């Protein structure tokens, strides 16, 4: 939107009599856009942080990239990320934006304030063990686990709660400006 305002403000100064703008979600013209260090998976872009940190540092690291901790809005998105990690042979645990910091027992995605509704929890999870598990990560939760699942863990520097993290870039928007001279 800021780009539109700047261009619209300068367009008459460049001798354009008429112009129109159009904003579309995504990249409908498949324009080449350098999204480094993000990796495209389906229609979204992700960074897989390699350092093991607590949930708060993971969140800060994503914000430094102008992104958010991953939010699984659909089971398909979760499955695509799990398939990507499996294809790389990565069975590490990764922080998501999910938590119940606002109200214990009610888990929301921090980045969009939506309830966590996907059914990808590990058996008997979330359990808020010890009354201190409030942030959601994905991983092979138990020794017998055969797939990525969600689990709640302490958000802070607990010895067993330092994980890698996944950042998700904001959805792209394409601004088209047509001018007539």
Regions found by a protein language model. Name each.
Residues 1-181:
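Extracellular, disulfide-bonded carbohydrate-recognition/adhesion ectodomains
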């Amino acid at each position: 939107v800021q780009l539109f305002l700047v261009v619209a403000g300068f367009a008459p100064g460049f001798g354009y009599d008429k112009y129109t703008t159009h904003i579309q979600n995504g990249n409908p013209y498949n324009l080449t856009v350098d999204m480094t260090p993000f990796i495209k998976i389906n229609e979204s872009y992700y960074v897989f942080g390699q350092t093991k940190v607590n949930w708060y540092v993971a969140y800060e690291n994503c914000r430094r990239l102008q992104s958010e901790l991953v939010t699984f809005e659909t089971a398909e998105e979760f499955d695509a990320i799990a398939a990507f990690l499996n294809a790389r042979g990565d069975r590490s645990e990764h922080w998501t934006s999910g938590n119940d910091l606002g109200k214990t027992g009610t888990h929301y995605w921090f980045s969009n304030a939506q309830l966590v509704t996907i059914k990808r929890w590990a058996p008997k999870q979330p359990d808020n063990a010890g009354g201190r598990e409030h942030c959601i990560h994905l991983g092979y939760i138990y020794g017998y686990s055969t797939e990525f699942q969600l689990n709640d863990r302490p958000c802070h520097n607990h010895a067993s709660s330092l994980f890698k993290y996944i950042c998700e870039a904001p959805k792209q928007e394409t601004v088209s400006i047509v001018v007539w001279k």
